[in-house]
Amino acid sequence: MTRTSIALLAILPGVFPCRAADGSRIDLAKGWWIQSSAKVAEKGDAISGGKYAPSGWYPAAVPTTVVAALVQNKMYPDPYFGMNLRSIPGTTYGIGTNFANLPMPADSPFAVSWWYRTAFQLPTSVKGKRLWLNFDAINYRANIWLNGRQVAKSDEAVGMYRMFEFDMTDIALPGAANTLAVEVIPPTQTDLTITYVDWNPMPPDKDMGLVRDVYIRVSGPVSLRNTQAVTRLENHGELAHVTLYADLKNTAASAVEGTLKAAFDNVAVSKKVRLEANQSTRIAMPAQDVAYPKLWWPYGLGAQDLHHLRMEFETGGAVSDREELDFGMREFASEVDAEGHRLFTLNGKKILIRGGGWSSDMMLRYDDEREENEIRYARDMHLNTIRLEGKMMNQHFFDTTDRYGMLVMPGWCCCSYWERWRNWKPDDYRIAGESLRDQIRRLRNHASVFVFLYGSDNSPNAEAEKVYLKVLEEEHWLNPYVSSAAKATTPGAGPTGVKMTGPYEYVAPNYWLLDRTRGGAFGFNTETSPGPAIPVLQSLEEMLPKEHLWPIDEFWNFHAGGGGYRNVNVFTAALEGRYGKAADLNDYLRKSQAMTYEGERAMFEAFGRNKYAATGVVQWMLNNAWPSIIWHLYDWYLRPGGGYFGTKKANEPVHVQYSYDDRSVAVVNSYYRGFSGYKVAAKVYNLDLTEKFSKTATVDIGEDSVVRVFEIPEMEGLSTTYFVRLTLQDSAGKPVTSNFYWLSTQPDVSDWAAGNGRYTPIKTYADLTGLEKLAPVKVKATSRAEQKGGEEVQQVTVQNTGSALAFMVHLTVRKGPDGADINPVYWEDNYFELMPGEKREVTATYQRKLLSGAKPQVKVDGWNVQ
């Protein structure tokens, strides 16, 4: 079932009927009301009483933050448009500052606690059962009341990344109305809460609220929790040892004897257990050997086989409690090589990490369909990893990454109280440790989760690291762990083997292969990028008022980042220096898409060519928390830009590429199988498309390898702006891929001495202004649709009918000839070139429902397309 926290229910106060969908869980998502404690005189015992009648409260659905619920109730204008966010009371912190590190303004409506209240009726079938009230995340503290009695106090229910469960059996009323009231206390600058660092602004409530699911679990006298499947492989994956764990708790006043049973695939195992009165214990089941197991692999490297595990405790001839989950048989490991670089392996195979940093929605609204679309976008770009810096996401996210074969590297966030260990009090260490424990318990069974970073920009102090490592050991975390996203060494974990040396602003495409000291293509760069990513016009029109679309002004800057990234000045200077000064908004946008295409392609290509001297790179970022002009591969409205398709091109599994450092042509194979008899061809063209060089070669490509085929020589008589076109065919002559570069005889020259962790300035720009002289051309497009379930696939044929190059040809699918574009659309290719007369076929896949009944229309535009 898809739940979106912004889908609030406008219903009258009353009792919401509840039932357990599977006999063991009752969701409390609907029928909530919220109000500021400043407007409520009563205390928790009265508010959670059945006679209390809320007046003037706001309807809500959980999970939701306070601000998200108020926005849904139209109390404030869309905070994501223009500078509307600044109009919400309490948003007085300096633009570009990290609000998480500042106190809440005293006059902010969110400086006080807010009440969440719901009334629900429990089914009579739960009578005689144990009832457990669960909160999967509360930001940040809470006093919890049920039916007039306090279930938990704020010193107990505390911690954004904690998961809480309370025995409500003696308070609940089966077959009758129940009232739950939660007083949520906002986080302060000295709490272990969520932060968006310099990525984007923060809502004025600091995301306070019930921000994950609230539900009731039903069990017999013995509850079963924290089921875990641990897999170890032998003989190159031909044998898997699977060990199962579960936590049992006897709530009865006397001893209970029973049987713990587990089953997956064709394996069944059981164990007799005796639990004394009120005893809690962890049970390890006998290890099971599985011969020739179906292993889990990332997408493109093998199947995403998952195994369904059912665990239950039976006593007195009845099932007291059960849990079910899917797990993957796979084994991750890592090592720090002789150069100090961390290299990850999966099932005994090396893997180059190609990833992007993820952000949750700024108001922590969750949408299952959107999540799946975004993960599919990542996979479509041939990325294999998503990094979560403090944005742990919900269960659906991890279930989806398991199914899609997308690796996940979660960890804590930087630049907040999480890294101010010198100020931590004893309770902070407790909260941090229990936060890690709860997150590890929910992450460890997911095949896609392969590492945990218990530090971000910095490694924790010795005391915090001891707390973290103790938790990882106790919870059977067998995946790798790293103490920081930056280069560091700690007593408990040794060297991190990674770097966090930038850049984050625009750098020249040749930077990645020429740099030897900072962010270049060596080692594992945990967060880096070629800087801003300007959205296309349609997105800018949705995020900015018309009068602020051009020129770039404070509205643009508000949708940039914070700290040192509050504008796009570095990017714009490079754009004008390389492509020529923008004549207007459309000119700026076409040049932006070209520059982000070549920038992202260059970064990923460099790490691909240099594997395994380069062991990983994480693009900062994959997506944004709100509409932004920096750090994404597709924008808030799910429109992919030039950076998306540059990334997709660079990371294709078998890829031919040009090297900016030595002019070599290389083939990069990411498959765990080789290919023979492949034909590589390279052509060099002047701006007017006169051919200046041509060469072909036949190569054999080993599994997961790189072959440098030949070099393109320096040559005389080139136009200042010129082109290189590469093609790759298989042994039967079938096209595998192609690649197209626009280059200059005047290369970019970086000012290495002035470089820093933010960026390395360019002192001489490549001259690509010749592109402005490309003659206008017409590109003809025809398409035919094919239905595949709920999806439609457009087979699009485009042809350049002009006599000049068609540059950066861009396709969109629209709702009829004059309708809006639809997104997400998964294009086989986009922002490509067409030679005069050239014809190309590409596919576009999308959900048919996005058309809203209209007839799809493929629209063509481009750099010089009429």
Regions found by a protein language model. Give the residues of each.
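Extended acidic/polar, glycine-enriched regions
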Residues: 173-177, 245-336
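Terminal connector regions
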Residues: 293-323, 713-765, 823, 845-866
